[in-house]
């Protein structure tokens, strides 16, 4: 078998036949892309990158750099944690990854406040991004609590 056969859609789907035979029904969270907290963080990241590229590409400021460096982390850490899984042996790693994302979300909020204080961001843009960043941070915190509860109860 050549490596390019792995690119064949039919080859990939052959491994999925067992699911149909057993009556397997996928849950809505079989993929990280379907996880609401990830969707929220991912869209915020995309919009933030667009903001940075359109308004701050030629500016060199510590708060802009902190924002740019931190804003990509929450979605990435949620995805990384999801990839570790939800089994009891791995959920601790999932939680740790998400906590790193939570710390980065807090750094995003701090950077946004600094950008507003320095008049780099106008009030309307600040309110939009700060409220969305806070929503990401809060939802990620709730998600971590849910993961901890799952671990505490021994629910895989």
Residue ranges of predicted features:
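Amphipathic alpha-helical assembly/interaction segments
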Residues: 1-156
């Amino acid at each position: 078998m050549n490596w390019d056969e792995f690119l064949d859609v039919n080859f990939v789907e052959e491994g999925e036949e067992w699911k149909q035979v057993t009556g397997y029904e996928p849950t809505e969270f079989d993929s990280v892309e379907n996880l609401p907290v990830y969707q929220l963080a991912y869209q915020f990241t995309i919009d933030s990158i667009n903001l940075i590229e359109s308004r701050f590409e030629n500016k060199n400021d510590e708060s802009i750099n902190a924002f740019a460096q931190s804003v990509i982390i929450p979605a990435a850490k949620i995805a990384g944690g999801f990839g570790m899984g939800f089994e009891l042996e791995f959920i601790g790693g999932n939680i740790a990854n998400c906590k790193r994302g939570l710390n980065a979300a807090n750094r995003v909020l701090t950077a946004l406040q600094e950008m507003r204080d320095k008049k780099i961001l106008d009030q309307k843009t600040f309110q939009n991004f700060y409220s969305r960043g806070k929503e990401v941070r809060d939802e990620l915190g709730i998600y971590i609590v849910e993961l901890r509860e799952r671990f505490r109860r021994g629910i895989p």
